[in-house]
Amino acid sequence: MAYFVLESEFSNDLLNSIKEHLRDRLPGVMVPTYFVNLESLPLTPNKKIDRTSLPAPESGNIGSNHDFIPPRTITETIITEIFSDAFDNPAVGIKDNFFDMGGDSLLAVRIISRISNALQKEIPLEVFFRFPTIEKFAQFVDSPAFMEDVSESLPSGEDLDTEYLSFQFIDNQETESFPNLDAVALSYIPESFMQVTGLSKAELIKDWFGNKARLTNSYKTEWGTIGLVMLPIAESDLYNDSNSIRSIIMDGLRLSAELGASKVSLTGILPLITQDGLDVINWMRENDEEVNLPIVTTGNATRCATIIKSVEGILARSGSDMSELRVSFIGLGSMGMSTLDLMLDVLPHPRGIIMSDLYQQEDRLKEFQDQLLASGFAGEIDICSCDTKLSDKVYEAELIIAVSNIPNIIDINKVRSGTMIVDYSFPSSFSVIDAARRAEQNGDLIFTSGGQLCLGQPIEEIIYLPRVAEEMLEIINPEKMQSIIIRDSKEMTGCILASIFTEMDSGVGVTLGKFTDAEALSHYEFINGLGLAPSRLQMQSYFVTDEAVEKFRGQSSSGSTSITG
C-alpha cells in the first residue's frame, strides 16, 4: 500500500503514470497494490511519519483506475469477502482485478478453494485466470455456460488395452491384504475425481478415504513394486493450512513405512508446497521419526530428465531437427531453468530461444540470457517479460516447452500452424480440449505431456477401491473414470518412477531443495542407461492419433507458418 500527498489535482492518468514509474524500478512484488491520497501525512512529535496513524483504505480512497463499486449479488458478496480477507483489505470492489491487486498463482489457488467451498461448486482454476475481476468471475460462475464449460470432454483419441489393469475392493485397515511395497509415490485427490464419483469433496474424503491416506494403486515393475498412496486432500486445498498438510503428509509416510516402502517420492505439486521437500525432512526430524520412515525425494531431477525425453519424443515423431527450430520456454523457476540447461547439455542447440515468465522481472530474465551466452549458446535469445498473458513473440517458436503453474497461459488460438508443445505444468498450460480438437481436425499442431516415460514392457497395475465403492458403482461415470485411470500399459510418469529409481545407482540420489545441473544430467544418463524411451504423445489420458501426427508431418514439411485462429 502506498500513501501520497499531491500538490496538484488527482487524475486517473496521474495514478497510472505513478504505477508505471514504480513498475519500471521495482520488482513486481514490491509495487503497491493500493494507493491512498492524503491531504497530509500524519507525523509523530519528532516530525517523523506516524505509520500507526496511516488510515486503512476506504471506498473513497484510490486503489485503481476505476470507481469503487460494492457487490450487488450474493455471489459477488461471497467472492468480495474472500478477496478482502485474502488481501487484508476491506475496500475491495467488484471491478478490482486479482492481478492488479498483486495476486499470484498460489494465492489464486487458495482463493479458488475457498470460493468453491462457499458456493459448493468445483470451480477450475483456469476459470479464475480467464475472469480475474470479481464482477466477471461471478457472472460466469452464475451463468449456464459455466456447467457447459467445465463438463466438456476430450475427443476419444487412441484406444488402449486394459489387460494390465485389475481392481480389488479393500479397506485401509486390511493392510495385510496389500502387497509388500518397495517404494511409494505420495499423491493427493485429483479435482476430476469428484466428478467421477458424484460425491462432494467432504463426502469423498470421509466415505472413500475415511479421513486417512490410503493405498490406491500398485505397479509391478522389473525393479520392484511401487505403491501410490493418496492423501485425503484435494489439490486446491493443499495451499491452505500448513499444519493440516504436515499431519496429512506424515500420515502418508507412516502408511508407506507400514507397507514396507523404503523410499517415497513427492508427486505433483507436493514439492512446491513443501519447499522442495525440505519441510518434510524437518517434520520428520522434529517428530524424531527420520530413522523409522522412508527416505524422501522430490524426484525433481528425474522429472527434469523426463521432460527432455518427452522433447526427444515429439521431435522424433514429427521428424523435426532441433537445430532448425526456435524454442519458446515458458516458466523459468528452478525446474524450468534446470530443464533448459539440461536441454542445452544433451540436445543439439536450437537456432533461437524465447524466454518468458510471468513472475520474473526483465532484469532477472536478462541474467538468464547472460548465463546462456556464457555457457556457449550461440543462437538468438529473446526475453519476454509479461503480466497476465504471454507476449505474441512466444508464439513465433516452432517448439513451446512450458514448465509453469498458470493454467491456460498458452492461447491455442494463437499457436501457429506447425507448432509442437511439451507441457509439464500443474495445471496444464493450455486447453487440452482445444488442442486435441485442432490436432484431430487440422493436423497442424501436436503436443504431449512432459511427464511420461516408456518402459518397453507392460506394467501390471492393481487399483484398490474401498468397499463403500461397491455400492457406488451405479452412480460412477464410467467414461470419466476411464479418463483418469487409463494409461498405456508400458508407460508411467517420471515422478512415480523417481520413487523406485532413488539410490538405485550412485548417480541417482535423493533430490531435496534446489538440485544441480550435474544431478539432472546424472538422472538423464541413468534413464537412458535403463533403455527407457519417450512415451506416446498424450495429455490427460488423451493420446494423439497416428493420423494426426501424419497430418502434422505433412503440413510441417510444406513449411506452413500461417496463424490459425
Residue ranges and their predicted role:
Residues 196-205, 427, 432-565:
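Adenosine-phosphate binding glycine-rich loop
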Residues 152-289, 498, 507, 511, ...:
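N-terminal ligand-binding/catalytic initiation module
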Residues 378-460, 467:
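Rossmann-like adenosine-cofactor binding region
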Residues 303, 307, 335-338:
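Hydrophobic/small residue at the entry helix of a nucleotide-binding pocket
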Residues 316-399:
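Glycine-rich phosphate/diphosphate-binding loop of Rossmann-like nucleotide-binding domains
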